[in-house]
Amino acid sequence: EYDANDETGKYVNRAISTEKAPGSTFKMVVASAALDTGEITPSTRINDSGIYPYGDGQACWYYRSYGVGHGYLNLTQAIKYSCNYFFYDLGYRMGIDTISKYASYYGLGKRTGIELIGETDGIVASREYANSIGYNTWYPADTLSAAIGQSFNQFTPIQMARYISMVANGGKNVDVSIIKSIVNPDGTEVSKEEIESFVKDTVGTENELTEDLDISEENLDAIRRGMKGVTSEPGGTAYSTFADFDIDIAGKTGSAQTGVEGEADGWFVGFAPFDEPEIAVVVLVEKAGSGGYTADVARAIMEEYFGMNSEEITEDKSAESSIESVR
């Protein structure tokens, strides 16, 4: 939260330093784990009957809102509708160790190595982390919470961008960089290895994700089709924002509870175009209340990127006096 009296907080680069629970945007991690380990297949159906029978009385958001569950859903549908019950069940079946392992496979909880000072690690919910802070008993309810992106899970927006890029590109590790190239005065290009060494020595960070995620295209396709349903099919949690969009988008909304009623952090993650991705977008709005607001921001970003924004920004001289008064 911005505070004009905080002389340090205003300079925080939130993209690389702010760690927030990802909420339902974490569900593609759990989906990847369940499919890749054979716990389910893309056609497996789970019956969301409302309140999950194990854990601590957790229920799907749909049940909380309408008094009934989603009914039988497969994975693609569960992502589209953001069905918590479905992912509670996957979490209960697999356990926290498998979930945390696949989160790490996607680079969550690991620095990207971007050439900026201040990047933080993030936190993957795990027994190891819990033990490190004196939380020595891991309960089933903790796993259910972690499976929908809560519990101890906290990641930076830049980590989330790498994660979504890997979902889009088939699981390939992504070099996160603000440098396209560096050219010496003699016209020769500085090698990637030299740049990485310099960044490590001066900024003190490096890409901590060293391997690709080996997951089948069939399994990733089931996940990505669910993300497409989020934006392009009635009932999708971002359908109202993208229903008339001219380009097919894959997306996922998320609302991460903060402990204060009505002040959930809102997320949107996505990529476009769906068939041949060019851009991954991550939007975080603190205390937004839900992930719906973030989809509007993501749409504006994509409109600008794809040249769909016909409005030109012009200088407004009339605004200068009012701006000066609040500096």
Model-derived segments and spans:
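Short amphipathic alpha-helical signal-transduction/dimerization elements
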Residues: A168, R299-S310
